[in-house]
Amino acid sequence: MSIQNFLLSAVLRWQKKSSLKLSAEHRFRRNRKWLADVRTKTKASITIQSDRIAGVPVEWVMPSELVSARQSPVCLYFHGGGFGMGGPNSHRALAAYLAEKAQIKMLMVDYCLAPEHPFPAALDDAKAVYLALISNQSESEAEADSAEIYNAPRPPRPLFIGGDSAGGNIALATLQAVRDLPPLPNLGAPPQGIFLLSPWLDLTHQNPSMLSNEKTDVMLNRQILEEFRERYAPGVPATHPRLSPLFGPVDGLPPCMIVASQAEALYDDSIKLHQKILGQGGSSTLLAWPKLPHAFPVMAGQLPEARQALDQLAHWIGQCAR
């Protein structure tokens, strides 16, 4: 365990303990504001562009030398935050690091948040952006100023899709939802890979790690997760496959990489998805790290372990993109 992880975990554990003394609403509003105020300084070699695709706000994070590269890989990414907080700004450290290491254009989706926009609003935003991207009907406002970046006969290839925590849920549910649509014309190739970082996939919260890791998870527990679920999907059965994509189909998925901490309450979500994909003949790689916080790769600006995990992810992306 790095000293950075030791210190950060101590802070997160204290924050979790103190926040549980607050009302659920107070805790949610405080954390939402904190994530909204996060500002990450990126290298001068990283270009950040705000945009809209299919009416949904997005942010491109990419190495500056790839701005005009029409065939470089693109990663459609969905941030975590319990479906109710966070945004491209809160995940910019991860996006910038992975963009540079994998030489990929990160497309960060600023999907609408609960409780103002309950289920399935976030998933609807995700599907709209994904379908627009693979059909080359992106309606990108930035294209007017930099059309040569994206305005190719087909979107830049290869395409990847990913997300952390609730964003991992959205990423997987998006692919499952799109596969159930009737055939659509003019669609490009499906993603060459999907990666999920500490994904929150089973919203019944009945997996053994929910209890066995209650003391080792420095960020989450069942109470906190159920509060997020009730804000996002009040009245929706927790077993609904679009809400809990672990219960949805996984056959036909592209190669999958899952990164998780063995200490987190959601660890079994990752294990079960990995086993389910392998059991149906698919390709899945699970990287299980000990003694790290939930969604630790997001903390690329603080943790050396986060950067090491993203280095492994970048290598995997490179292999899938060949």
Regions found by a protein language model. Name each.
Residues 1-66, 322:
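A glycine/proline-hinged amphipathic helix-loop "lid/cap" segment
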